[in-house]
């Protein structure tokens, strides 16, 4: 399984929730190939400089594992082999995350897993909610010595 979707003219790690059904890049996967990406935390770097950016770890208050909303697809590589790929769905950030990054992963509630996976004529857009700040713990870890690419997106 590879992280990110590869298209003829584009590569993307994540999928924006806004417009997910309007874009031919993600529409079919959202309608037919929803998945979860288990995690116990995720990391973001607050981009202030080309390097030495503050690193944050984000968990849920219980510190239990949680499920990031995802979609998957099959990509045909140059050798002609089909490879499974996955992309995490992101939303606009809540007020706390907006201080660090302009997007945040969609976290699904356990009570919503069955609906997320259920085949449906109407994909569950309402589950792509912005997780409120009180449902996240954001902890500054360190300034991370990482050189950012000049054309990073």
Roles of regions detected by a PLM:
Residues 1-153:
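Short linear sequence motif anchored by a di-proline
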């Amino acid at each position: 399984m590879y992280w990110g979707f590869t298209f003829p003219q584009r590569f993307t790690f994540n999928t924006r929730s806004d417009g997910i059904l309007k874009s031919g890049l993600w529409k079919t996967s959202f309608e037919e190939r929803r998945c979860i990406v288990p995690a116990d935390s995720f990391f973001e770097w607050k981009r202030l400089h080309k390097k030495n950016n503050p690193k944050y770890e984000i968990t849920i208050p219980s510190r239990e594992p949680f499920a990031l909303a995802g979609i998957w697809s099959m990509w045909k590589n140059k050798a002609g082999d089909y490879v499974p790929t996955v992309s995490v769905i992101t939303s606009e950030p809540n007020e706390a995350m907006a201080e660090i990054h302009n997007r945040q992963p969609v976290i699904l509630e356990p009570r919503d897993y069955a609906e997320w996976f259920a085949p449906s004529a109407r994909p569950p857009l309402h589950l792509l909610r912005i997780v409120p700040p009180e449902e996240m713990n954001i902890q500054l870890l360190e300034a991370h010595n990482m050189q950012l690419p000049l054309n990073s997106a």
